[in-house]
């Protein structure tokens, strides 16, 4: 060890769960966000290496840092080394088809990653002059999304929903469709979700050839996991690790990248777990007082530049289905489109359970999507809204008490509701029906035909779980037989 490195060694003075304090020699203090490394041996004599990130300078030559892995086996007095730089992770094609942890170490058992380039996970967002401002739609092949709440290329999209309404399945379908239809690269950040789901996603991707086991570099996705069992430090930073990998594809390879974050709420939750240990006074509902800043720092780096774009799709767990909770409310401020998943639709068996009236998009404007698309979407929403208003009357008095006109609205609304469902490629295993990719033009055509009354004679079950309108007509013919 050189003389310079010797100077940068401190010692641990206190450990409180995932947070530890260390004392350094005068004038040798590490900077905020520097990575510190503790090397030790546990009781079994195995080597331990714990990486921490400096969060606070406490005075009296002490710093407070958050550990990225478990602090079991560490004790006071152990040496701690200042690396002199923030955490850096591998970037580039070498990351495709692999699973990394927050430190950029592969955790898939396929050997080490020898990266030509590493990037620090903390960096500034692009400057104003680097940003690209042109508006264009990102077609997903999912009817309800493309028609009613279209995604913006280089935008941020929130997937809102409680537990078990299908957020992760929708994300898997999007990765699949984007890889097949756009040939784009995706980066998936698993932030504080179930390890089983992470494993299922990986296996699913291998089966659908999104990850190519024979030739990993031709894979379409890099995975970064910091799951529920990880300490809060890892869950707080794993989103930045995934974002750093996505930024390289955008800035250096000039690609359009999809960044999935599942789940952005867990990023906030991890921040709130360490906030109190860092000595900060809690804010509303016990969240960290720095909530807006932490969210803004992450979100402002996700954007389109002159080089390429990062389109981000973020699953947002809504605690107790309360959209006014500070975590989802802070996330809302950054989004271009919201896809809200509804428990009522899931209970009816309509998948994807996207709520057509609650989901919104800033892209649904006639001068962006065109008059035909805008007009069809508005008519679909009006029909569904009228049906919603009539539901109380139907529940109390029955359908027969409605006027002829309202009965027609209800019949068409029920067809629209069913036609908004769609078989997914990634759900073929469960449903047995092959997945369908529906182009935007086909979606508009189908809904226009229903609204114009051209299909009033068909039974409503013909519209359930089909792709385009031709399939619904064919299904109606087989139902008659």
Curated annotation (Swiss-Prot):
A GO CC annotation given for this chain: mitochondrion
Localization of this protein: Plastid, Chloroplast thylakoid membrane
Keyword Plastid: yes
UniProt keyword list: ATP synthesis, ATP-binding, CF(1), Chloroplast, Hydrogen ion transport, Ion transport, Membrane, Nucleotide-binding, Plastid, Thylakoid, Translocase, Transport
GO molecular function: ATP binding; ATP hydrolysis activity; proton-transporting ATP synthase activity, rotational mechanism
Residues holding ATP: 161-168
EC number: 7.1.2.2
Bilayer disposition of the protein: Peripheral membrane protein
GO biological process: proton motive force-driven mitochondrial ATP synthesis
NCBIfam families noted in UniProt: atpD
PANTHER family for this protein: ATP SYNTHASE, ATP SYNTHASE SUBUNIT BETA, MITOCHONDRIAL
Quaternary structure and interacting proteins, as annotated: F-type ATPases have 2 components, CF(1) - the catalytic core - and CF(0) - the membrane proton channel. CF(1) has five subunits: alpha(3), beta(3), gamma(1), delta(1), epsilon(1). CF(0) has four main subunits: a(1), b(1), b'(1) and c(9-12).
Primary role: Produces ATP from ADP in the presence of a proton gradient across the membrane. The catalytic sites are hosted primarily by the beta subunits.
Full protein name: ATP synthase subunit beta, chloroplastic
Organism listed in the record: Mesostigma viride (Green alga)
